[in-house]
C-alpha cells in the first residue's frame, strides 16, 4: 500500500489534552484498556477457528506480551489475535475508536463523580494517549493475502499509515511515553498495575523488560517441553559412598542417582490466572481452594468464616464469590471490599450502584458480563436490570444464612458474633433483606444460649416455669380479669443488657427469679432494635435497668408510703438533687440495697447521640437527652433499714451518697470527679469501722 496521511477529526485538537487532564488520577487504566483489546482479538480468532472460518495451528496458544523499556521510554503490548487489515485500521482505529473516545469525553468530561462511568470503562485504544506523546500500531490480519500495516499518531489531528514489516498474525501497539508517565515503563510498576486490572483475564499475560539479559533455569530432561530453548545438556553421574553393611563389611552404596538435566532459557510465568475460582462450578471447588483464593485476592491471612458461590446464567449472567470475614473485636474495621469484574476484567471496587450497600461489609468478587458499563453511575441507580442484579445477590445471601440456620444451627451460632453486625446493618439498609432474615436473627442471652426472636417470644411451657414465674403468671391473670376487655394487650417485653459486667447486679436479680435477658453490646444494636420495634407492634425492647419488673418485687410486704416519703427526703437532701425520683420497694433479694433505673427512651436517645458524636457527625449534646433516673431502695435491706431508722444520724448523708454511687456503677461509669469522691468516701466508711 502507498503511504497515507489522514485527519482524525476537525474537532480533535482538544481531545488528547482532555484525556490527559480529565483522567489524571486514573492514568493506569490504559493498561487495562489495551490488554483487554488484545484479549478480545484472541477470543475472536478462536471463535473463527471454532466456526471453521479460520484454521489455527495445532500448537496455537493465545497470549499477550507486555514489553517495557525504561531506557527507550516505551511500552509494547503485543497479542497474537486476529490482527487488522489497512481498511480495518482505517475503520476501527481512525474512525470508530476515535469517534467512541470523542463521544466518551464529550459526554462525561464535565460531569460530577456521581455521573462518571464506573472505572472509566470504555475509553478503549485512545486511553494510550493519557501517557504517551506518540502511539504506533503494527498489525497483520489473519485474512488470506493480508499485508502488514503500520499506523502512527503523535497526539495531534493527523495520523500516518503505511506498509509494515510484521511477520506474524496479531497486533503490536507501541507507546512512546511522555516524561510525566515514565513510571509505567518500570517493570515493577507495570506488574503492579497489570495485576490490579488483569489478574483474571482469560488470556495469559506475560511481562518482560525489553532487551534484558536472558535468565536460565535447570530442569530434569524428562520435563522438557517443545517450547523450551535448550542452552546446555548436563549429565551428572551417580554418587557413591563407602558404608558398612549388616555383616560389618564395607561396600559402595549409591547416595545420589545419575541425573540428566537441561539448562534452558527461563520459562516465562503468566501474571494472571485465566480460570479464576468463580468461573468454576461450586461442586468443582474445594474448601482449601476457596481459602487460598481469599488469601490471594484480599491479602488477608485470617481464614474467612464461610462463603457464598454465586453462579447464575439466566435471566442474566452473574458469577462470583462472597466471603464473610472474621472480625476479632468490635473495634476491628468491618469495611469490606467487593471487586466488580466484567468478563474477568477488573472494573472497580465497591460500586454501590450495583452492589447493595450492606454487602460492602463483606469481601468478594462479582463478575457480570451483562452489566451496562458505558453508562454513568447515576444512570445505574435507576436501571431496572441493575436493580434485579442487586436483588438477586441480596436473596442469595439471605438464602445462605437461612439455610445454615435451618440445617447447621451449631455452625450458625458459632459464626453469629462475627456476622451479626453485617446482618443487622443489612436489616437497617434493606427492607426486603430484613423481611427475609428477620426470624433467623439470633440473640445471645445471659445464659449463653442463642435464640431467635420467635423463640424468645414463645410462651414458656407450664412444666418449664419456675415457681416465681408461675406465681407471677397467676397474679397477672388476676389483674387481667379486672382490666377493661377492650384495652389493647400489652406488648411483649424483651429485656436486654449492654454490658454484662457493669449490669451484673441486674443480671443476678433476673437469674434468681428465672428471668432472661439478651445481650446487645454492639454499637449498631440501638439502631437495630429501634427499627425492629417500628416494624413490629407486638413486642418492645427494654434494657434490664430501665425498670424493675414485678417479678423482682415481694408484694407481701408492709405498706411503704411513709418509708418512701422519709427516704426520698433524706436522699434528695444528701445528693442535693430535688429532681431525683426515689422509690422504696420490697425486693426479693435482701442483699441488694439500691437499684438505679433509667428510662429506656431517654437512655436510648443518649446512646444515639454518643454514636453520632463518635462517628464525627456532630449533632446535639447527649446531656440534652439525660435519661430520667429513679433510685429504688430495698426495704428488705439492712442498710436501708438503718438509714430509715436513723435518718438524723451524721453518717446517713454519707451512706446515702454511697448507695447512690453503688447503684450508678451498675448503670454506667462514674465521672472522674464522682469516682474521686467515691474512693474517698469508701475510705471514710472503712475508717468508721475501725472506731
Residue ranges and their predicted role:
Residues 117, 135-158, 178-181, 188-691:
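GHKL/Bergerat-fold ATPase module in large chromosome/replication-associated machines
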Residues 1-185, 192, 199, 215-222, ...:
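GHKL (Bergerat-fold) ATPase N-terminal catalytic module, capturing the glycine-rich phosphate-binding loop
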Amino acid at each position: 500500500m502507498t503511504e497515507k496521511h489522514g485527519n482524525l477529526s476537525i474537532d480533535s485538537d482538544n481531545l488528547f489534552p482532555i484525556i490527559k487532564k480529565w483522567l489524571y488520577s486514573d492514568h493506569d487504566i490504559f493498561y487495562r484498556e489495551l490488554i483487554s483489546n488484545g484479549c478480545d482479538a484472541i477470543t475472536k480468532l478462536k471463535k473463527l477457528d471454532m466456526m471453521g472460518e479460520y484454521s489455527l495451528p495445532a500448537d496455537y496458544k493465545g497470549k499477550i506480551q507486555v514489553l517495557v523499556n525504561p531506557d527507550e521510554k516505551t511500552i509494547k503490548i503485543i497479542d497474537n489475535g486476529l490482527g487488522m487489515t489497512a481498511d480495518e485500521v482505517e475503520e476501527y482505529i481512525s474512525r470508530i475508536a476515535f469517534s467512541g473516545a470523542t463521544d466518551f469525553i464529550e459526554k462525561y468530561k464535565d460531569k460530577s463523580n456521581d455521573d462518571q462511568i464506573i472505572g472509566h470503562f470504555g475509553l478503549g485504544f485512545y486511553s494510550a494517549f493519557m501517557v504517551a506523546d506518540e502511539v504506533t500500531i503494527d498489525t497483520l490480519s489473519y485474512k488470506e493475502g493480508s499485508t502488514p500495516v503500520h499506523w502512527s499518531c503523535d497526539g495531534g489531528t493527523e495520523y500516518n499509515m503505511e506498509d509494515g514489516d510484521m511477520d506474524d498474525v496479531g497486533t503490536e501497539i507501541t507507546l512512546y511515553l511522555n516524561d510525566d508517565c515514565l513510571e509505567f515503563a518500570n517493570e515493577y510498576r507495570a506488574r503492579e498495575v497489570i495485576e490490579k486490572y488483569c489478574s483474571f483475564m482469560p488470556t495469559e499475560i506475560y511481562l518482560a523488560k525489553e532487551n534484558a539479559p536472558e535468565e536460565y533455569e535447570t530442569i530434569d530432561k524428562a520435563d522438557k517441553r517443545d517450547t523450551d530453548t535448550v542452552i546446555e545438556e548436563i549429565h551428572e553421574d551417580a554418587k557413591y559412598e563407602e558404608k558398612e553393611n549388616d555383616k560389618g563389611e564395607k561396600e559402595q552404596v549409591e547416595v545420589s542417582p545419575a541425573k540428566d538435566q537441561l539448562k534452558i532459557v527461563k520459562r516465562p510465568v503468566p501474571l494472571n490466572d485465566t480460570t479464576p475460582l468463580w468461573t468454576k462450578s461450586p461442586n468443582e471447588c474445594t474448601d482449601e481452594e476457596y481459602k487460598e483464593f481469599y488469601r490471594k485476592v484480599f491479602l488477608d491471612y485470617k481464614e474467612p468464616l464461610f462463603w457464598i458461590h454465586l453462579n447464575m446464567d439466566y435471566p442474566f449472567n452473574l458469577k462470583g464469590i462472597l466471603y464473610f470475614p472474621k472480625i476479632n473485636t468490635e473495634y476491628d474495621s468491618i469495611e469490606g471490599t467487593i471487586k466488580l469484574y466484567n468478563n474477568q476484567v477488573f472494573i472497580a471496587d465497591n460500586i454501590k450502584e450495583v452492589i447493595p450497600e450492606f454487602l460492602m461489609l463483606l469481601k468478594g468478587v462479582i463478575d457480570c458480563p451483562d452489566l451496562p458499563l458505558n453508562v454513568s453511575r447515576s444512570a445505574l441507580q435507576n436501571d431496572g436490570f441493575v436493580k434485579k442484579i442487586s436483588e438477586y445477590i441480596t436473596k442469595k445471601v439471605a438464602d445462605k444464612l437461612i439455610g445454615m440456620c435451618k440445617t447447621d444451627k451449631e455452625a450458625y451460632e458459632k459464626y453469629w458474633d462475627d456476622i451479626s453486625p453485617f446482618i443487622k446493618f443489612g436489616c437497617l439498609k434493606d427492607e426486603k433483606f430484613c423481611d427475609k432474615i428477620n426470624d433467623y436473627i439470633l440473640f445471645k442471652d445471659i445464659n449463653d444460649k442463642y435464640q431467635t426472636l420467635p423463640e424468645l417470644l414463645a410462651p414458656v411451657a407450664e412444666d418449664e416455669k419456675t415457681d416465681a414465674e408461675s406465681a407471677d403468671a397467676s397474679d397477672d391473670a388476676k389483674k387481667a380479669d379486672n382490666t377493661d376487655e377492650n384495652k389493647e394487650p400489652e406488648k411483649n417485653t424483651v429485656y436486654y443488657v449492654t454490658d454484662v459486667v457493669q449490669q451484673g447486679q441486674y443480671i443476678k436479680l433476673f437469674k434468681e427469679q428465672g428471668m432472661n435477658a439478651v445481650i446487645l453490646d454492639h454499637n449498631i444494636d440501638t439502631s437495630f432494635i429501634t427499627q425492629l420495634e417500628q416494624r413490629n407492634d407486638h413486642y418492645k425492647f427494654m434494657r434490664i435497668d430501665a425498670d424493675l419488673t414485678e417479678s423482682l418485687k415481694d408484694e407481701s410486704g408492709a405498706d411503704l408510703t411513709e418509708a418512701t416519703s422519709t427516704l426520698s427526703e433524706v436522699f434528695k437532701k444528701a445528693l442535693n438533687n430535688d429532681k431525683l425520683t426515689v422509690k422504696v420497694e420490697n425486693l426479693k433479694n435482701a442483699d441488694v440495697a439500691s437499684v438505679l433505673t433509667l428510662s429506656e427512651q431517654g437512655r436510648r436517645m443518649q446512646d444515639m447521640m454518643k454514636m453520632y458524636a463518635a462517628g464525627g457527625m456532630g449533632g446535639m449534646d447527649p446531656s440534652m437527652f439525660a435519661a430520667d433516673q429513679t433510685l429504688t431502695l430495698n426495704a428488705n435491706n439492712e442498710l436501708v433499714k438503718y438509714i430509715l431508722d436513723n435518718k438524723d444520724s451524721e453518717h446517713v448523708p454519707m451512706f446515702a451518697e454511697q448507695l447512690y454511687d453503688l447503684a450508678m456503677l451498675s448503670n454506667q461509669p462514674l465521672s472522674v470527679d464522682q469516682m474521686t469522691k467515691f474512693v474517698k468516701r469508701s475510705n471514710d466508711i472503712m475508717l468508721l469501722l475501725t472506731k
